[in-house]
Amino acid sequence: NYSTLKGAKLDYKKQLNTLQNTEKSLNIQHRQLCYNLTSAFERFNIQKQNVEVTQRVFDNISKKYQYGMASSMEVTTAGTDLVSVQSSYVQALLDFVNAQIELEKLLNK
């Protein structure tokens, strides 16, 4: 029957469009998740460096304090800065792991 064949062709075209749209959507999502992972990794590395620098500053101020060349307020401020930077580092690590998980979920790994 001609109308049945025509209807089947129309359904086929609809399904093909749906498939193509899904592929495009998945490709866009993949690119976005790759970008998110790269950005999270860069932030993680920056925060890691910040922790290293802030730790050195704290250590130096602590040594100065031992020799009477720095106040307890300076040690407290450096310690607070170190804790803050460590917190940012942990958050960056968490963001990186979450970005990796999201990409792996998309890739079914």
Question: What residue spans do the PLM features occupy?
Answer:
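Solvent-exposed, flexible loop/coil residues
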Residues: K6, T77, N98
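Short amphipathic coiled-coil heptad-repeat segments
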Residues: N98-K109
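Conserved active-site region of classical short-chain dehydrogenase/reductase
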Residues: C34, T38, V90, V97
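Sec/SRP-type N-terminal targeting helices
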Residues: N1-E52
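Structural signal for well-ordered, non-membrane alpha-helices
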Residues: L16-E23, Q55-S62, Q100
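Charged, solvent-exposed structural "stalk/scaffold" segments
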Residues: E42-Q91, E104-K105
